[in-house]
Amino acid sequence: AVMGRNLALNIESRGYTVSIFNRSREKTEEVIAENPGKKLVPYYTVKEFVESLETPRRILLMVKAGAGTDAAIDSLKPYLDKGDIIIDGGNTFFQDTIRRNRELSAEGFNFIGTGVSGGEEGALKGPSIMPGGQKEAYELVAPILTKIAAVAEDGEPCVTYIGADGAGHYVKMVHNGIEYGDMQLIAEAYSLLKGGLNLSNEELAQTFTEWNNGELSSYLIDITKDIFTKKDEDGNYLVDVILDEAANKGTGKWTSQSALDLGEPLSLITESVFARYISSLKDQRVAASKVLSGPQAQSAGDKAEFIEKVRRALYLGKIVSYAQGFSQLRAASEEYNWDLNYGEIAKIFRAGCIIRAQFLQKITDAYAENPQIANLLLAPYFKQIADDYQQALRDVVAYAVQNGIPVPTFAAAVAYYDSYRAAVLPANLIQAQRDYFGAHTYKRI
């Protein structure tokens, strides 16, 4: 409800009159009461709401993904005319969007599945917007979406036509997977700095402030520096009294499931999903901590040197994560015939969304230089970073393993990097085993 309200207010603030409807009359009245003088027009029946709109009608749905979306569409259909446009801005599974697009197209309606990132504040002030569906329908809503989208530093709005049917929601799903990876990598960096150097919250905030002024400059690093020094009403550091169980809404899982369907090695992002799952086994972990032995963390040595190693490891880990995510976008684009523009996708992530970061421009540049590049690690800038920073990543992972500090995504980054650069892997033995017990055959060199 908050996302829908904020998007309505955003659209209204750009000079539009907005018809609004909610199943709950009270919620509609509440929005009107809280926003006097705004060009928001309330309606209390679907029929009146639809009839209030100019044709072709442009209807933005912001409802809980799943059955709720189908129910909302079904309630609208009796009052729609051919050519009307429904925009689904929810966190919808892309296969559902493909299905709805197909069904509504057959009835003469247009359906635009649209990823919206930036949370409640982004919805109000300018989100990153990822629309997918019929190109001609997108052209009819583009003027509105362009006006309400976040604006990057170079003045470009953070919205672009992504591709047919489920492309927009697919890109949003991968965006969310990348977000999982970013957050877990940052959490592991925090764990290493606390476990290896015993940094105070003030020192952690200072470290992240410095990081945010360099290559790692991003929304997530920026908010993390603030989180470290936030105190509760009792004067305790808030982060230190938050239970170590990370919840999830399932979008990271969808990204990993799609990777399995496509045969894409999305290891880092998948480890970040699993890290949330194991965090939720709090009772088991507490019990296991009293039974299972392991090393106690020893000092990581020189403070400045280790902080810099962790910074480098974090940046290279982030690059590996995005390389995996964009490789998956390429595989999905081929599978679903979307013709995705990867440079443009990186561009619209530069503002408004949760993963906004300075280095996204480097991704856009890499695809501008070579649109067909198979993997971002092969682009000159990222190859150079890998050359310069891989030793730090290896050192940090080795330290973590020796000292019993779990770093699933840092470790996944090293494993993927070494696997990807290996001309020969031991898979020949696996294939021989498969042939031995199952007559699966093999290819000779």
Swiss-Prot record:
EC number(s) given by UniProt: 1.1.1.44
Pathway: Carbohydrate degradation; pentose phosphate pathway; D-ribulose 5-phosphate from D-glucose 6-phosphate (oxidative stage): step 3/3
UniProt keyword NADP, yes or no: yes
GO MF term list: NADP binding; phosphogluconate dehydrogenase (decarboxylating) activity
Residues bound to substrate: 91, 117-119, 175-176, 180, 249, 276, 434, 440
Protein origin, superkingdom: Bacteria
Keywords assigned by UniProt, alphabetized: Gluconate utilization, NADP, Oxidoreductase, Pentose shunt
Chain residues that bind NADP(+): 1-4, 22-24, 63-65, 91
One GO term of the biological process aspect: D-gluconate metabolic process
SUPFAM superfamilies: 6-phosphogluconate dehydrogenase C-terminal domain-like, NAD(P)-binding Rossmann-fold domains
Catalytic activity: 6-phospho-D-gluconate + NADP(+) = D-ribulose 5-phosphate + CO2 + NADPH
Catalytic residues (positions): 172, 179
UniProt keyword annotation of Transmembrane helix present: no
Residue intervals passing through the bilayer: none
InterPro entries in alphabetical order: 6-PGluconate_DH-like_C_sf, 6PGD_dom2, 6PGDH_C, 6PGDH_Gnd/GntZ, 6PGDH_NADP-bd, 6PGdom_BS, NAD(P)-bd_dom_sf, Pgluconate_DH
Family: Belongs to the 6-phosphogluconate dehydrogenase family.
Function field: Catalyzes the oxidative decarboxylation of 6-phosphogluconate to ribulose 5-phosphate and CO(2), with concomitant reduction of NADP to NADPH.
Subunit composition and interactions: Homodimer.
NCBIfam families on file: gnd (TIGR00873), PRK09287.1 (NF006765)
Name of the protein described by the UniProt record: 6-phosphogluconate dehydrogenase, decarboxylating
